[in-house]
A protein has these predicted regions:
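A generic structural signal for short beta-strands and their flanking turns/coil linkers
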Residues: 7, 40, 56-58
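Nudix hydrolase/Nudix homology domain
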Residues: 7-9, 76-119
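The catalytic Nudix box helix
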Residues: 11-44
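Conserved short-loop catalytic and cofactor-binding motifs
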Residues: 13-14, 48, 93
Length: 119
């Protein structure tokens, strides 16, 4: 998760461009918003057409080893902004300052991830 200085708590997400697959879009958005450039396999965990009317949301899981609990990334969008990243426990409820959309996303993704991780 990350804290956007103007928009609050968010998750990495974005639009699938016409020339790319949903997995390629996920990888591109991950790099753009977090600076993580990975060639590791992304695991598809779900597709949802009810998050936002008229949109298809694709969900991916990435196995990632990380030694830091928090980090920041300068994203060039919107004139350049600093995003504060942190890990959110899988079984924890959405943070109280998380917007309703991202709370729904977390609540949708949690059981998909638990199945994927066989927890």
């Amino acid at each position: 998760m990350f804290r956007h200085p103007l928009a609050g708590i968010q998750l990495v997400e974005g639009t699938v461009e016409a020339s790319e697959s949903p997995a390629d879009a996920a990888r591109r958005e991950l790099f753009k918003e977090s600076g993580l450039d990975t060639k590791q396999r992304l695991f598809f965990i779900g597709k949802n057409t009810r998050m936002v009317c008229g949109q298809i949301w694709y969900f991916y899981h990435l196995d990632l080893l990380c030694t830091r609990n928090q980090s920041s990334h300068f994203a060039p969008d919107d004139g350049g902004i600093e995003l504060q990243f942190y890990w959110h426990a899988l079984l924890a409820p959405p943070p109280p300052d998380c917007g309703a959309l991202y709370a729904r996303v977390l609540n949708y993704a949690r059981p998909q991830l638990l199945r994927r991780l066989q927890l």
